[in-house]
Amino acid sequence: FLETTPVQELTIPVILEGKDIIACAQTGTGKTAAYVLPVINELSKGLHPANAINAIIMAPTRELAQQIDQQIEGFTYFVPVSAVAVYGGTDGIAWEQQKRGMEMGADIVIATPGRLLSHIKLGTVDLSQVSFFVLDEADRMLDMGFYDDIMQVYKLLPATCQTIMFSATMPPKIRTLAQTILKNPEEVKIAISRPPETIMQTAYVCYDMQKLRILEDLFSKSRPQRVIIFSSSKMKVKELASTLKRMKFNVAAMHSDLEQSQREEVMKEFKNGRIDILVATDVVSRGID
């Protein structure tokens, strides 16, 4: 960053003051750095336990957890602050690596709710020294049914823990969650979620059987490049991807049946332009940069 973004300018001082905060900011506003940088700054002072987990960052998807972990890795290159990402969809080796990282007291744990609770239930994680509790994309976590998981984790945290909540939208359920877990919070609203102005939006009112014909028509008018098609279930994703492949389109599918390494490879191929069309479940919509 050459200069702070609006959300960073408004939230970083509040977090450094030790206050709870709820910030409404959409993806692309620099929100990750808005909470990561002040947390790293505080942990780098050496005033927190060296062999304990000092910060928990919860994210709705493993893709977002990975992105946050990568940013922290870059920010802490010259800083004695450690981090570990904890998420599902991995093999036994990855589970052991996650377990070892938490048992050794990684300063920052970035986790999806379900996997973090699994480690808690097995007694592999101690939250008694946590000073920072961050919820990134809190609205998405509630949409995915993680309210009870969030509360289970929250109840294990010290009463003195500072809580930081980021959400792209501010529906009543987010207000309710904020009232439950935040203490006299500051509130920041920056660019409440709305579609980018550069994107043309078109709605097609049709039956399921007509959707493929519409896609054919769209792709016949212009060659598909960097196209993402979201579908509501992995079954539909598989079916659509197979159909498009038979139609000679360069397409790949992204869904929960893929191993983590396979999902990463698909995203790499898509970002590098070797895949024209990515068909994915809508749960992947958060976490794609």
Language model: regions and residue ranges:
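Conserved helicase RecA-like core
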Residues: 1-289
